[in-house]
Design a protein with these regions (language model features):
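Active-site rim/loop-helix segments in enzyme catalytic domains that contact anionic ligands
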Residues: 1-104, 131-138
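Metal-dependent de-N-acetylase/amidase catalytic core
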Residues: 77-256
Length: 256
């Protein structure tokens, strides 16, 4: 979906992929990420990159991951914000463009229907790939990454997953090289100290009901919520002294 997702969730297959398709580029309200992504794709070390370059929908913080509601476009976006309208429009654009890009493909590896760590645009890309691949014989595979925010969505997933599972060693050298490019261009979106797992697994999506399950090793990510900003004790004391001085001035008639 986004620049850097390809090395976070698909590093093991990246170098051998016939196409590496990035869906989104500009980020509303974040000029540094937008410019950095354009610079990174122009400097990308692998030649098979395809950049659809849609603008993201501004909905990252709109989802309550304790009660996500699936929709045809991915997830329902609460409220009537412009981000929700962009999200719906992006789905239609993705289906059209991916239909062209996936023509003739035998296998496509894309985001999971629960969005890995929890990203509504990842889920949207999965839905768009499934819609685009509907009229072809292309097999769709999803990565085995899940977080504490999305494990419930994985458990309740209505998408049929087949028995075929592929487990491969991650390509950590390539992943780190491309991560360095994103970091140099100030558009790396993941944890700075992230350590890739030794392996990652992919499971095929079935278009028919599946009676039997499969053993599927998944990588679990613990999402760390951002810590609230903290004021230093010195700043707190200075603000308290200033407030007391203002109160004293009011009481003696010197204030405005």
């Amino acid at each position: 979906a986004h620049p850097d997702d390809e090395i976070l969730w698909f590093s093991s297959i990246l170098a051998d992929a016939g196409k590496i398709i990035l869906c989104f580029e500009d980020v509303p309200g974040n000029r540094h990420w937008s410019e950095g992504r354009r610079a990174s794709t122009s400097q990308y070390p692998l030649p098979q990159l395809v950049n659809i370059a849609l603008s993201e929908a501004d909905i990252f913080h709109a989802i309550d991951w304790t009660t996500p509601v699936p929709s045809a476009e991915g997830l329902e976006i609460p409220g009537t914000s412009s981000g929700g309208r962009v999200y719906a429009d992006n789905f239609r654009r993705l289906v059209d463009r991916l239909g062209d890009e996936l023509d003739g493909c035998s296998n496509v590896f894309t985001h999971a229907p629960w969005g890995e760590y929890g990203n509504a645009e990842h889920i949207q890309v999965f839905r768009a790939v499934m819609a685009a691949a509907e009229s072809s014989s292309c097999r769709v595979w999803v990565p085995g990454y899940v977080s504490n925010a999305t494990v419930a969505l994985l458990t309740a997933c209505e998408v049929e997953l087949g028995r075929d599972v592929i487990t491969l060693p991650t390509n950590q050298a390539l992943a780190r090289d491309i991560a360095t490019l994103y970091k140099a261009n100030n558009c790396w979106t993941w944890y700075k100290d992230y350590q890739w797992p030794a392996q990652e697994s992919f499971r095929v999506v079935s278009t028919e009901p599946v009676d039997e399950g499969a053993i599927w090793p998944v990588n679990h990510i613990s999402i760390r919520p951002p810590a609230p900003p903290r004021q230093s004790p010195g700043l707190t004391r200075r603000l308290a002294r200033r407030f007391r001085r203002l109160v004293n001035r009011k009481e003696t008639g010197h204030g405005r």
